[in-house]
Amino acid sequence: MSSTVLSVEPDALPRSGEDAAAIAEDARLRDDIRLLGRILGDTVRDQEGEDVFDAVERIRQTSIRFHRDNDQPARDELVELFDGLSTPATLRIVRAFSYFSHLANLAEDQNNIRQMRLQNGARPGSLVATLAHARAVGISAKELRHFFETALVSPVLTAHPTEVRRKSTMDREMEIARLLDRRERLQMTPEEIEQHEELLRRAVLTLWQTNMLRRTKLTVLDEVANGLSFYDYAFLHEVPRLHGVLEDKLNDDDGAGEELASFLRMGSWIGGDRDGNPFVTAEVMRGTLRLQSRRALRHYLDELHALGSELSIAAHLADISDELRALAENSPDTSPHRAGEPYRLAVSAIYARLAATAHRLGIDDIRAPVAESAPYAEPAELKADLDVLHRSLVANNSAVIARGRLRSLRRAVDCFGFHLASLDMRQNSAVHERTMAELIDKAMPGKSYMAMNEEARIALLAAELRSPRPLASPFVKYSEETVDELAVFRAAAEAHATFGPAAIPQCIISMTKGVSDLLEVVVLLKEVGLVDPAGRSAINVVPLFETIEDLQAAAGIMDRLLGLHDYRRLVDSRGGVQEVMLGYSDSNKDGGFVTSGWELYKAEIELLKIFEHHGVRMRLFHGRGGSVGRGGGPSYDAILAQPAGAVNGQIRITEQGEIITSKYSNPEVGRNNLEVLAAATLEASLLQPRLGAPCVGYLKAMDEISALAFKAYRGLVYETEGFEDYFWSSTVITEIATLNIGSRPASRKKTHKIEDLRAIPWVFSWAQCRLMLPGWYGFGSAVEAWVKAHPEQGMAYLQELNREWPFFRTLLSNMDMVLSKSSIAIASRYAELVADEKLRAAIFGRIKREWHSSIAALLAIMGHQRLLQGNPRLERSIRHRFPYLDPLNHVQVELLKQHRDHAVDEQALRGIQITINGISAGLRNSG
């Protein structure tokens, strides 16, 4: 039997009619898949024996038949195959299919890199294409530079637990990815090819012998360390490089030779997000900031060390500036070998001061200084010294040297400072409310804050904001919760003093319900000196609107807030910018995919009107997940689908879980994704507004479709008797909680109510059983009902919406992708886990009808014959995955039966956890 376990089935080949380029592209991808599949197959045979290898192949072939034909004989054969396996053998098979998923992803990533190189930057979403578009409509390089002076593009990494792989596994996979890329780039002799394959075999074997699952639960600082690894992989080098590329392109256009303002800033929630995570404390936040600073300073010191080696310029061979000479004279380096090398001496002076800075910040385990020196007080001082080197080189005919490592380092210091990434503080409004209530009740006996209505609270909090006296007293005993909250705010004030105001520039309030939720935080910030009674604030107070009801109330809340004189002074002190965060996850769980997307869009339109009325600049922060059910999908399309004027040069957007890994674990892919964010922000700000707002008819139609979809979704999820039992029985929601993939609990409360479940495990569970219900449910019946109610417009009108309206087109495109990954045949096997046959038949039958209805409606509107017809590359990619993805689902179902039939079955549970890992990898954006 062939050892190519990970083979490509006929239905995964290019379809007839696809062009020669697509066929050639697919052939290269299949070659890589075959190579990795052959190596993994050999590894499985060598390590586990011929019987396990043969079982893997039989399961794969039978699973393909089931997927293709959905026939009962194939299902029965699968059950028989699993019944004949011992649990240890099943675990080996599960690991094999899971690693097939991981390796196929690497082959696909390499194929994407290959296509990026072939396109050479001229692709939709690239800076090349966007700048060409800008030139075509008459926007000059000077105007673009001016735009970037106030622009902000900020990817914000979060620790939301959707990445199920261990870092050790990811490290091994990155090694394999590098080997694949080397094979692609280099012309090899037959002997070198053989040696290269040996390296691949070694890496795959090491991967096979590495624990796939974490043995212990992650701590918050573990999550911080994992997040920081992506700075080494991509951000520290690629953020400066992106600025340099854009700077050069603008200067090529007009020859101005001007430097571009830094606009790309990294953000993070890891170590600052306390909403529902009791393990994020003041001390953890301090530790997070130290770890971040350590990563930034280590990078700068390493780059200075390399720069000192490179700048071997002799004083008698090249002139230098007076300021460079003065900097060199301050060097502690007394070696006679460098006496005539002023740039090296200047670099050593900078190095000594930076090492002293690290010591001042409590970071002593990186490169030591060559001598004592005065630390830098702030990053601007370090940047000023680096600028001295730059100016001297440019003034003395060495600009080409200045454009190398020195330019990258100068830009890095400008973008990352001493803090690396801006850490957001986030907490639930209910916690702030309880904290404020205790402070007020103990400071003002006789008052009961919790008994006050909203207007009374606003009046009291506004008065407290103006008062110079603090509310908290060191002589009063407070509850543990209040003590902890005050400690976190004090830690934020310390961070500003130590690392600068960019270290913690935002305080986000989850579940914002009213104006008082924001004023409570403002008063707490005043307690620690980050807000003063004179109307100055050192931090942005950011409401997060998450549920459908909250999104509908958002504009009214912001109108009232911005109309308060005391609060408006704080906004003005922050440059007249107010940030608003929109939550995609909870709004989806609350109202379904269609209504969530529509209410978010409408909220932006209404907020724009309010902010324009008050003369305040709005910055939106999009809390998107990886899956479409949590606001995921291509970033470029998502940004361009925003209402005209909503981006306006500034955007923050969350990146989380498996999406961080897929976007930023490879430098080239990372650079491309950062470029997409920058290009989309530019295009949405300067080019999209020219298209104008959608017509009133489009908005009315979407309002009606949303209401119908909302009714269908709520009717199933919240109003169907027994739905909670069905959900908990037919998905892996219980078993997901056993994975050590994050520090945060899976539920807000220990109940089985859907309302209390966090959005991530909700979406993750539906992805595992291949229904992806949060990404489409309600759409089909809504379209059917709308078309029936509007026969004069009918389907043709919805087809017009798809052609003419980016929002609607993006909504459908994301649904197209989700449905293509779903499988009603696979989902039917999970329905078997529901013991109550009547409940199973009723609910699964309803879901199945809506699934077929949604696909039919989607295809009719898009004018397609099959899912992903308009995206053949993604279609082929998903078809490639089914041969090794589907078997994992079948094994998972059998293991769930086994595990749930026995009180304790640790091996079965471990097998389930491995299938969760593999299915997540195969889907690529499951949470």
From Swiss-Prot:
Active site: H160, K589
Recorded name of the encoding gene: ppc
InterPro entries xref list: PEP_COase, PEP_COase_bac/pln-type, PEP_COase_Lys_AS, PEPCASE_His_AS, Pyrv/PenolPyrv_kinase-like_dom
Keywords on record: Carbon dioxide fixation, Lyase, Magnesium
SUPFAM superfamilies: Phosphoenolpyruvate/pyruvate domain
Reactions it catalyzes: oxaloacetate + phosphate = phosphoenolpyruvate + hydrogencarbonate
Any GO BP annotation: oxaloacetate metabolic process
Xref: Gene3D superfamilies: Phosphoenolpyruvate/pyruvate domain
Disulfide bonds: none
Name of protein: Phosphoenolpyruvate carboxylase
Record organism: Rhodopseudomonas palustris (strain BisA53)
GO cellular component: cytosol
